């Protein structure tokens, strides 16, 4: 039986930021260098995640990506040959839906990071829009990240890979993930026949539908990209009021129940 797995994985950080043990998008293709100006590489203590720039000072990622001495890289495409406009920041503040780090609670795996200073928009750095409405079933969406391109072999690309997947009926995910409630604030997305999926190391990265961030990579199957085992994404639309309140300065804002 495919085991549920949390998608952050050990990353051996080297000066070149080469990855030796993390994983990312399965069944995709190398992203175009201009395709992901909002994509953030989040790393700490040997772990890596993805993230999404939503304005010059704020990043969305998964709560289980939290850690000490976090760094965030913007404008990154090739890890070995960085863009000239690459920028690095650290968190100034972090905001969570949970008072504890029990991030496995469905629909609460979200973290909002305020940067220590704003990033400068450039050729390879620009925010992604928040959702204006939730995605409907069968919507084609995009996933992306810097990890393994094989579910069984350690094949790590230098540049992020992208893949298209579909928003699926929530019942498909409930059939596989014990305890996932029908009304949980999550999205179920993938390819029913398998072959395309997020994987370890993709945690916190975006699910992009119609040019907007609709989901945050949370939990998936192990091995990745198995038939009828889609991944679960925190549903950004259901957290819009909380996100906007925090950014507006209401740091006591509470998450939706």
Swiss-Prot record:
Listed under GO biological process in this entry are: proteolysis
Q: Name one GO cellular component term.
A: extracellular region
Please provide the record's keywords in A-Z order: Disulfide bond, Glycoprotein, Hemostasis impairing toxin, Hydrolase, Protease, Secreted, Serine protease, Signal, Toxin, Zymogen
Record's InterPro entries? Answer: Peptidase_S1_PA (IPR009003), Peptidase_S1_PA_chymotrypsin (IPR043504), Peptidase_S1A (IPR001314), Trypsin_dom (IPR001254), TRYPSIN_HIS (IPR018114), TRYPSIN_SER (IPR033116)
Q: GO: which molecular function terms? A: serine-type endopeptidase activity; toxin activity
Q: Which residues are glycosylated?
A: 116, 120-121
Q: What main location does UniProt list?
A: secreted
Q: Which residues form the Peptidase S1 domain?
A: 25-248
The UniProt entry annotates the active site at 64 (charge relay system), 109 (charge relay system), 203 (charge relay system)
The subcellular localization recorded is: Secreted
Top-level EC class, please?
hydrolase
Superkingdom of origin organism? Eukaryota
Q: In which tissues or organs does this protein occur?
A: Expressed by the venom gland.
Which Cys-Cys disulfides exist here? 31-162, 49-65, 97-255, 141-209, 173-188, 199-224
Q: Which residues form the propeptide?
A: 19-24
Q: What is its EC number?
A: 3.4.21.-
Signal peptide location in the record? 1-18
> Which family does the UniProt entry place this protein in?
Belongs to the peptidase S1 family. Snake venom subfamily.
**Role of this protein:** Snake venom serine protease that may act in the hemostasis system of the prey.
Q: How does it assemble?
A: Monomer.
PANTHER family the UniProt entry points to: KALLIKREIN-1 (PTHR24271:SF47), KALLIKREIN-RELATED (PTHR24271)
Q: What is this protein called?
A: Snake venom serine protease 2C
